[in-house]
Every structure is written in structure tokens, then in C-alpha cells.
UniProtKB/Swiss-Prot annotation:
This enzyme is necessary for target cell lysis in cell-mediated immune responses. It is an enzyme of class 3 (hydrolase). Residues 1-18 form the signal peptide. Duodenum, lung and spleen. This is Granzyme-like protein 2. GO terms for cellular component: extracellular space. Residues 21-243 form the Peptidase S1 domain. Disulfide bonds join C50-C66, C142-C207, C172-C186. GO terms for molecular function: serine-type endopeptidase activity. Belongs to the peptidase S1 family. Granzyme subfamily. Transmembrane segments: none annotated. PANTHER family: KALLIKREIN-RELATED, MAST CELL PROTEASE 8. GO terms for biological process: protein maturation; proteolysis.
Length: 248
């Protein structure tokens, strides 16, 4: 299905990460075929407001704070202002974590059931999830991708990506009481200045081809590191919830 996508910035709460890749680069077109653009209807058009990623043919994972009504999911996009051979879906069920806390953003994870199964091809693919015992270690460098603002605050129509270093949990704990290393990741080296920002929420933090984190929040405006949801902790919940979503 062809879709002409017009990107407009959505307004999100201050502490959430909603499409900004700072000091990153443009992704090779369709090199991250698991990426999803989440759009919701605002005014008289659909607007990109969060990222997500395909974990099964009809299931997209994202952040719980990205929950909106009338979500459209776009798969197979690179330039969201050009006509591309994308697949467009309505969401029939949204399942945020039942213990999601909108203040601390603890348990900031959600699964979306699509209206039909995606057709997997060269530009639309699923991404692997970690095992429950897999923990990303401080010093490891992984990648986040998203659509939106660049370092100069201009809007990008193309998918951007940036490599970010995992930090020790103490660094985030020292900046905020609302950090729990068992369910969250502390990401981004302050000395490098690379970051995620508005519009990237819900996108995957990918380490060696595995989605290890979900872009969640920043500790305070303009600061590093960022806080991501640690996916491996939620594997039992993910497995249980995917089974529930597959039921008629």
C-alpha cells in the first residue's frame, strides 16, 4: 500500500522522549526494517508521534506513554514525506503494562495488536528479543533509530540513527530517584552529547541485532544520560501478553 506521509511534530509531556536524534546520521534506507512509525489523528491529519518495532507479524512493541486512541502504524518507511511502498495498519488492541506509572515511567512498555499480519519482505521484518537473563552491560555501545528533529532543531524526513553507550545505573540513580536498574537502562555518555529526544519514544535500543531497550525518558531537560526500558526483565510479561493478544 502506498502512503504519502507528512511528518508533523506532536506535543508530548516534558519528561518523555517523543523524535530527535542528536549528532546521529541518516540510516541506510530500509536497513532497519523492524522500525515502525506510530501516528495519531490530530487536527485534520495523522502525525508521527512515537516509534515502535515489529516483534511478530501482527505485534508492535513501543512505550506505554505512547498510548493514544486511533493509532496508525506504518511499516517499511524511510522518508516519511515521500511515496514509498509502506504497509499501513490500524491498531485493534493496545496493551500497556498494567503497572505502568506515568510519573516515574516505570514499566514503560506496551504491545499493539495490528488489524492483520504484516507481509514480511526486504523492508518489513521482525526483530529478535533478548532472553530474560540477558543483561546489557555498562560500556556496551548500541543503536537507536527514529524520525524527527536533528541537532540544529530542523525536522528530518528520513530515519536517523545514533550509537549510544550504556552507563552504570548509579549515574542515573544519582540524578533521579525515579530510576530502577532492574527494569531500566541508563544510556548515553554525557561527554559525547549524542542523544534521543522528542519523537523517538517507543523505538528500540538495538544491541547486536537484538532489541534490548525501549526509548522512554530523559532525566531532565537537555541532560544525559537517558532512561530506557530494559526489555529482558519483561520477557515473561511479553510472552503472556502476546498470547492474550492472539486470542480472538
Amino acid at each position: 500500500m502506498f502512503l504519502f506521509l507528512i511528518f508533523l511534530v506532536a506535543v508530548l509531556p516534558v519528561n518523555t522522549e517523543g523524535g530527535e536524534i542528536v549528532w546521529g546520521t541518516e540510516s541506510k534506507p530500509h536497513s532497519r526494517p523492524y522500525m515502525a512509525s506510530l501516528m495519531f489523528y490530530y487536527g485534520n491529519s495523522y502525525r508521527h508521534y512515537c516509534g515502535g518495532f515489529l516483534v511478530a507479524k501482527d505485534i508492535v512493541m513501543t512505550a506505554a506513554h505512547c498510548n493514544e486512541s486511533n493509532i496508525k502504524v506504518i511499516l517499511g518507511a524511510h522518508n516519511i514525506k515521500k511515496r514509498e511502498n509502506t504497509q499501513v495498519f490500524s491498531v485493534v488492541k493496545a496493551k500497556p503494562h498494567e503497572n505502568y506509572d506515568s510519573h516515574s515511567l516505570f514499566n514503560d512498555i506496551m504491545l499493539l495488536k495490528l488489524e492483520r499480519k504484516a507481509q514480511l519482505n526486504g523492508v518489513v521484518k521482525t526483530i529478535a528479543l533478548p532472553r530474560s537473563q540477558d543483561w546489557v552491560k555498562p560500556g556496551q555501545v548500541c543503536t537507536v533509530a527514529g524520525w524527527g528533529r536533528l541537532a540544529n532543531c530542523t525536522l528530518s524526513n528520513t530515519l536517523q540513527e545514533v550509537n549510544l553507550e550504556v552507563q552504570k545505573g548509579q549515574k542515573c540513580q544519582g540524578m533521579s530517584e525515579d530510576y530502577n536498574d532492574s527494569i531500566q537502562l541508563c544510556v548515553g555518555n554525557p561527554s559525547e552529547g549524542k542523544a534521543t529526544g522528542k519523537g523517538d519514544s517507543g523505538g528500540p535500543f538495538v544491541c547486536d541485532g537484538v532489541a534490548q531497550g525501549i526509548v522512554s525518558r530523559r532525566l531532565c531537560t537537555g541532560t544525559l544520560p537517558r532512561v530506557f526500558t530494559r526489555i529482558s526483565t519483561f520477557i515473561p510479561w511479553i510472552q503472556k501478553t502476546m498470547k492474550l493478544l492472539q486470542q480472538p
